[in-house]
């Protein structure tokens, strides 16, 4: 069978909002997500910093200031709260079945600037052959320490190439 890859961003593609808006931003003190994202933009500009690294850094700093411990499980659990667009959960099986009828092996991939651990907590995580998304480095207690991988807009093209080459 011929292999076909469907490649998705996550935020505002499969879900109506940025994943951090499903609880974690409120917990660190942002009732209005725009205030957080504006702060991230300011930090990125002031420090000539990649915006993805800036949001990851800011999540760490804000959580520390509020005494909130963000670890793998915290991110995974917040992923369970992410709302998906109507029809998204059914889409994957439908398109795989459609492809199979036509002799195609359909695979689904995520390439996202969002957080991999949160995507893993969603109800659709199992649908993906691979999830390429931003990740944190964790300490011995699984608490986040620092951004480990930040997938920005230009890096996404690198992952398209990797998928095309069979990873």
Where are these regions (language model features)?
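Conserved acidic, metal-coordinating active-site core of Asp-based
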Residues: 129, 133-167
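Alpha-helical substrate-recognition element adjacent to the catalytic core
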Residues: 1-145
